[in-house]
């Protein structure tokens, strides 16, 4: 949902403050840098733990949804129909790109520390999606840095027009890899039925696919058969998108049905278990999550997550919230934590494995 909110917010800001952004670009850069530093401090300090309102408010910044929305307008500006919006965005492409890059760096630094720690350690428990997303992120940071630096007028003048244009063609690779990165981040939770991820992924898919088709059409120009080729591509893409969306909807419904059925069928009772400390693991968003459950006098005394590969601070919210909820309810029939669905479900599945162990 933050993707949709961010796109609307950027649209309003560009329409309302285009003159101020152009005139006071340096102020925008400085403000973006301050916001990035604040995001890093908030994420590293864990200040959002236990405060749902703050998490929701800061999510567009901590998740880079807002900076991605800015890049989306920069990307789509060249293929928009001539009009007021295109005129305003085209006049601000450099300023918007630099601002988005600064904001994105805050996101990269905030979450990059955990990525690097896990990548430098044992990768055996990390999912393929996590490894690919991490590798793509590194390439994106490099491309983004090059494009942002060359967007400054002083650098552009020294490079020369031809060289600058060749470098700026890297933007196409940047946009393509951005969609790949978003897919690896959003698809796992979207396919598990998390509605905000479904909405964001469908929205990004429509935007990036539309841009790609319009960009190809513009590149072909008035060549013979160009319109027919683009029309055919649009038709094929539309059919593919409908089929993919239908599959996602069916998968989402099936996942929801399985969760509902599993919840109804649960007969996991700690009262039937002997006292002791039990261990189990389950697949999280990025890899294996391991935990221990302490049983005493027929009650769950503690649920302790001893290791996971999921992204903080989101995973920490699930570890704190779901673990406490299970202890409080003495059951695994508890709600997942918003924005940490995969980690929440992994905790629940691992505890269920323990409670379903046969007792002598």
Curated annotation (Swiss-Prot):
Keyword Cell membrane annotated: yes
GO terms assigned for molecular function: FMN binding
Major location (coarse): membrane
Record localization: Cell membrane
Signal sequence bounds: none
Lipid bilayer topology: Multi-pass membrane protein
Domain of life: Bacteria
Residue ranges of the TM segments: 26-48, 58-80, 89-111, 126-148, 169-191, 195-214, 227-249
Keyword list, A-Z: Cell membrane, Membrane, Transmembrane, Transmembrane helix
Recorded GO CC terms: plasma membrane
Protein name, UniProt field: Uncharacterized protein TP_0572
